[in-house]
């Protein structure tokens, strides 16, 4: 968050109680009265880093993918609002590298999509600079159809027409795609 959302690292370290490991622990740590409704989503970046450690920028193994899907499923069962993934070439980590998961294989995302389908809960939020790529469109369409869950695609300037076209097609099929 400190590099993607421009939140100073010191503010994160001082303002967030870091004594948690699981998503349920995290939700418990922030369970205090708020003046607004707050929903927490499972970020692909964090799950990938947790499962793969320093290898989080590499291709995931079958075991890595299974672990990411299991963690996502458990987080959804524990109260996560949904799952998010960034495939946007403007999201960098604090070292200047693209965030983990930017180049994740569609099969990895489909496995995580299966977790959403099994729970039948949650939303999917995607930001991608590759929506003109048929492979990218394929896994997004697959997740929308497999899960039946709402999918939000954040539109970057170079892919708007591709996203709108896909959304119109899938919405006509009764799916919930929102650019």
Segments predicted by a language model, with ranges:
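Divalent-metal coordination cores built from histidine and acidic residues
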Residues: 1-83
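Histidine/acidic residue-rich metal-binding segments in metalloenzymes
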Residues: 24-30, 59-179
């Amino acid at each position: 968050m400190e590099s993607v959302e421009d939140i100073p690292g010191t503010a994160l370290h001082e303002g967030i109680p870091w004594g948690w490991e699981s998503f349920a622990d995290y939700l418990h740590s922030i369970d205090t009265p708020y003046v607004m409704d707050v929903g927490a989503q499972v970020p692909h970046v964090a799950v990938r880093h947790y499962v793969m450690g320093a290898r989080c920028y590499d291709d995931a193994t079958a075991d890595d993918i299974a672990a990411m899907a299991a963690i996502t499923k458990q987080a959804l069962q524990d109260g996560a609002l949904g799952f998010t993934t960034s495939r946007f070439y403007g999201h960098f980590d604090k070292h200047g590298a693209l965030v983990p998961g930017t180049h994740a294989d569609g099969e990895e995302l489909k496995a995580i999509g299966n977790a959403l389908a099994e729970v039948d809960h949650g939303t999917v939020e995607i930001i991608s600079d590759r929506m003109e790529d048929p492979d990218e469109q394929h896994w997004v369409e697959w997740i929308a159809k497999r899960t039946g869950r709402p999918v939000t695609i954040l539109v970057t300037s170079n892919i708007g027409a591709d996203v709108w076209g896909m959304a119109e097609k899938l919405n006509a099929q009764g799916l919930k795609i929102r650019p």
